[in-house]
């Protein structure tokens, strides 16, 4: 019998890619959506999943868990803001702390014990990696305290996967690698930071394979676990990333290094964390860039 997954954030880039991967592998998949969810990027699989609407109330997610009773919950949903305004504080707390807490409470009531959480390297900032880059990262860190409680008090097994930069076809987010691809296509000047910061770039295929593999680890675990691993791809400086896009495309990028300052609280190098070891061959960065260049999806 195929396992059942409940996925939050399935209409986003990583969540949608994860849902597709689980379906390819034979999982039965249910997704949690909101009344405002945009399904335009998931039309290829929406008919293959059971979609449930979460209205913001605890009872709503309780009823969803009672109906689905998944083998594993994949919590990918989050509100990502590099900088926030006072008007966005409530949304950050609601999306990144409240919703996840409601989800864990519903898991307890439904007897669901396996949970894959999504973390961010922005939770590890400063000399000892104890600070958060921004309020978004601080809410993610606060939520992990909630996870620890449910793990300890209710024996929910957890693997948190820490993401850095992700990329792939269909990514509509404003990400550096997408900006570089656009610069190649349009032959436009791009204003950049000095470019000495180190980034860690992972193809979304490797990310979702890691999620699926971690879920299998939970299914096979014989005791309650609470583990955390980083997903790592290619580590290189921004200048080196520009050079790699130039190499693969065969075109010079009109990059103005130093055209803008580093961001406030710029991360100059990703934290060194225990890595999730892949059981497959990862997508080479050059091949991933070639895939983006050849894609008509922008």
Model-based region annotation:
Residues 135, 141, 145-199, 204-212, ...:
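NAD(P)-dependent short-chain dehydrogenase/reductase
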Residues 8, 32, 73-77, 115-121, ...:
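SDR active-site strand-loop-helix element
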């Amino acid at each position: 019998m195929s396992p059942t997954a409940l996925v939050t954030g399935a209409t986003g880039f990583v969540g949608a890619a994860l849902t597709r991967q689980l379906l390819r592998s034979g999982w039965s998949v249910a997704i949690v959506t909101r009344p405002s969810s945009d399904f335009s990027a998931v039309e290829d699989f929406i008919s293959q999943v059971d979609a449930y609407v979460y209205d913001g109330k605890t009872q709503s997610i309780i009823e969803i868990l009672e109906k689905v009773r998944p083998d594993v919950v994949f919590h990918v949903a989050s509100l990502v803001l590099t900088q926030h305004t006072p008007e966005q504080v409530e949304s950050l707390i609601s999306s990144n702390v409240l919703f996840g807490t409601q989800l864990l409470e519903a898991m307890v009531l439904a007897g669901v014990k396996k949970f894959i959480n999504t973390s961010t390297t922005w939770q590890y900032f400063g000399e000892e990696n104890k600070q958060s880059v921004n309020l978004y990262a601080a809410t993610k860190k606060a939520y992990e305290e909630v996870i620890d409680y449910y793990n300890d008090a209710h024996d929910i097994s957890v693997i948190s996967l820490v993401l850095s930069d992700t990329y792939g076809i269909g990514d509509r987010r404003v990400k550096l690698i997408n900006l570089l691809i656009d610069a190649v296509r349009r032959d436009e000047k791009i204003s950049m930071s000095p470019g000495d910061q180190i980034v860690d770039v992972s193809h979304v295929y490797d990310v979702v394979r890691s999620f699926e593999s971690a879920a299998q680890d939970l299914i096979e675990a014989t005791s309650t676990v609470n583990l955390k691993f980083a997903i790592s791809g290619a580590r290189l400086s921004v200048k080196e990333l520009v050079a790699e896009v130039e190499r693969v495309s065969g075109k010079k990028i009109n990059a103005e290094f130093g055209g803008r300052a580093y961001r406030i609280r710029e991360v100059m190098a990703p934290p060194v964390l225990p890595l999730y070891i892949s059981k497959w061959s990862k997508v080479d960065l050059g091949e991933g860039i070639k895939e983006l260049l050849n894609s008509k999806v922008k």
